[in-house]
């Protein structure tokens, strides 16, 4: 046993007295009544706020969603296997917030912005509330700048502007994610920060998407937020709001951002699961009554801010999956009514080898030509009409035996325009080359070519135009000189 001198004992006691604090810390503490299926019912937290974070005895975080007269219904941010009935729960006095900032660029994180890519921790200087109000009417300006996707069919006929919400909708395996990833890849030199939110997907699918973005050099300006299929329903519900909060941080700094929610059907299903377990009354298709508000409060955060607020923008590309092409189901109709247009992908077109499988007839952009450069507006005006007439004639020609010359020519033109719009995945086309391809298609330069010769011909034309001063000229303005430049190159290769 160590012998202590009296003066040592007295100095230790003196130190203890000096360090003694009379501060009293108040904690609101409750008790777990019931736990299971990612839901906990807590008794005794009378002063808790809706959406407040709760801390359980095992360190699991929960969110208070149901405030009832005798208990609080909370969703758990984890499996909650170590939470026992009768254990203690503390209220934190805080609403959910996540770290934001440029430190997240190039990283893959979960719905709570914890890194899951094995590249070490992330130290950010700022945080932001997961749920924050959307910009008001005065804070916005109308969409006026184009956001090029690099996909000819979209940039020509269904243009997307910075600050727009454009829905990508279609059955499973029709190329919805491919369009979203191509759009991210095309932002390489455009100074746009991209956030890709994967909700309820297989981990292998997310890994493949991250790998593709990394291969194309797109991870330098991209943040991936993922809540996989095996994650808790609460994390799948939160992931889109986390993505929006990350993008909002950059938007309010005056930067252009692009957010992809892949897909909101899975988020709605996770929210339905949570609501039913919390015993909220079910409505149509067993979804709770506020499922419209679930998506509207998320998508309304996308905006083009006015000059006083820095002129930043958040463009949202939500994805919704349909069953057997049924666009009139509950979630699809909800999201269609919230967004500024939709790109409809058809499984019939996909199976017929037309990729991207965009059904031009029922796809629409409500922003329209305000989100196009002047040259594209000039050239692509006739394209949608020609394709619509072709679709109508093609259906009619299956029943007619003999067709007149004009009808045959129109059918031939439509087939060649379809070839122009075909595009392989992860190979976005610059806007100036798209204009040249469409100009060749609508002005009859491809009419005499066989269908299999269309793509090789266009690729030769594009290669030559790249080396001329055509790209910079066509971006500034459509003029007779630009048109003559195009005609010279087309006639040279048409011989």
Swiss-Prot record:
Residues marked Required for activity (site): 363
E.C. no: 7.1.2.2
UniProt keyword terms in alphabetical order: ATP synthesis, ATP-binding, CF(1), Chloroplast, Hydrogen ion transport, Ion transport, Membrane, Nucleotide-binding, Plastid, Thylakoid, Translocase, Transport
Residues reported to bind ATP: 170-177
GO cellular component terms attached to this protein's record: chloroplast thylakoid membrane; proton-transporting ATP synthase complex
The reaction(s) this protein catalyses: ATP + H2O + 4 H(+)(in) = ADP + phosphate + 5 H(+)(out)
GO molecular function terms noted in the UniProt entry: ADP binding; ATP binding; proton-transporting ATP synthase activity, rotational mechanism
Enzyme class: translocase
Taxonomy, superkingdom: Eukaryota
Membrane topology: Peripheral membrane protein
Location within or outside the cell: Plastid, Chloroplast thylakoid membrane
Function: Produces ATP from ADP in the presence of a proton gradient across the membrane. The alpha chain is a regulatory subunit.
Assembly behavior: F-type ATPases have 2 components, CF(1) - the catalytic core - and CF(0) - the membrane proton channel. CF(1) has five subunits: alpha(3), beta(3), gamma(1), delta(1), epsilon(1). CF(0) has four main subunits: a, b, b' and c.
Protein family membership: Belongs to the ATPase alpha/beta chains family.
Identification of the protein by name: ATP synthase subunit alpha, chloroplastic
Gene for this chain: atpA
